[in-house]
Amino acid sequence: MVEIVSAHTDLRRQGVRYTGLCPFHDERSPSFSVQSEEKLYHCFGCGVGGDLFDFVIAIENVDFPTAVESLAERYGVEVKREDEDPQAEERRKARQRLTELMERTASFYSSFFGDAPEAAKAREYLAGRGLGEEILKDFGVGFAPSAWDTLLIKGQQAGYSIPELLRTGLAQKNNKGGVYDRFRARITFPIRDARGRVVGFGARATRDEQKPKYLNSAEGELFHKSEILYGIDRARGPMAKAGRAVVVEGYTDVIALHQAGFTEAVGVMGTSITEAQIAMLSATVDTIVLALDADAAGRKAMLRAQQVAAGRSLRILVVAMPAGVDPAEIATAEGGAETFRELVDAAVELPEFHIELVLAEVDPNSPQSRDKVLGDA
């Protein structure tokens, strides 16, 4: 239990128990206690408590069956399922093999990033962006070798078939039917679902001739970009504690903000926020802070959030990001954590942001301006 809880708050041993700051409410003095032998937790500040299952249910905002499956997967325990028909069991086990393949691939990419001479420029690039080794390791950032068949060979050597490699999106076919690695000579960011399972990868180019600059896993059995948020596995607990989610665009934005202490940050992996992503956030928080880039695409995405969140009891705030600067650049600069905190504190309600956008785009001396403002706002 100590291992599970330690992923959400720092614990210090005091005899037979461990103490730390409560992950469920803000406090300055530790009032959260874990009894390691009894496998129980209790907070003397807010009163929450229970066993390991209660903790997972509360911190991850899931039901009991999901908590059981999450813990079983973490510790490699197979959960017996009564009355499961053979076909359903076969599908479940086949999917489990795919997630295991993705996890092994993430580990391989991470090790290659840390050790391989070929990844030296990638390490230099991320260090130059102000991202430390510890946070990169925490997020499992890796590097895909430049060879066309490294993963194909390693995957088959580990007992996985080419169809399985294709189903995960780790391999793809060319127009002649040949199969090759999808990610090559790219920085890799493992994308995990809310339960911490690797379902896909984002991959950044390291060479000028590589297009596109960012390449995601193909949509498939495991990966559905519109239904996942980068960093959600790490951010859900902090989100619940803070009562808000900070939503940014890219992988490095999320990593940099977590490094700066904004562990409630998640990424939409692009500019568009979807109904599924809004639903995922609203299950945990009642406030969403949008910190998207201050370009046309970012502004459009922020306005779209207003549409997809319609009908939900959500408060949506918009951070006025400086032009030409992304959250990662702010967070990794000297004094960046305080600068970003000030930007978040100054965030405006989404309807107010919408009106400000409309006013900025019209000529105040034009007789048509009033009609445009009233029509668009």
PLM-predicted stretches and their roles:
Residues 53, 245-247, 285-297, 319-320:
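Acidic beta-strand-to-loop metal/phosphate-binding motif
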Residues 1-85, 89, 334:
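N-terminal structured subdomain of primase-like DNA metabolism proteins
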Residues 83-84, 136-137, 141-143, 147:
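Terminal amphipathic helices with adjacent charged low-complexity linkers/tails
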Residues 58-77, 185-205, 329, 333, ...:
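Structured, non-catalytic alpha/beta "coupling" segments that mediate domain-domain communication
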Residues 66-121:
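Conserved active-site segments centered on acidic
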Residues 14, 87-107, 145-288, 302:
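Phosphate-handling DNA/RNA-contact segment within nucleic-acid enzymes
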Residues 314-377:
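C-terminal or mid-to-C-terminal helical accessory/interaction module adjacent to the motor/catalytic core
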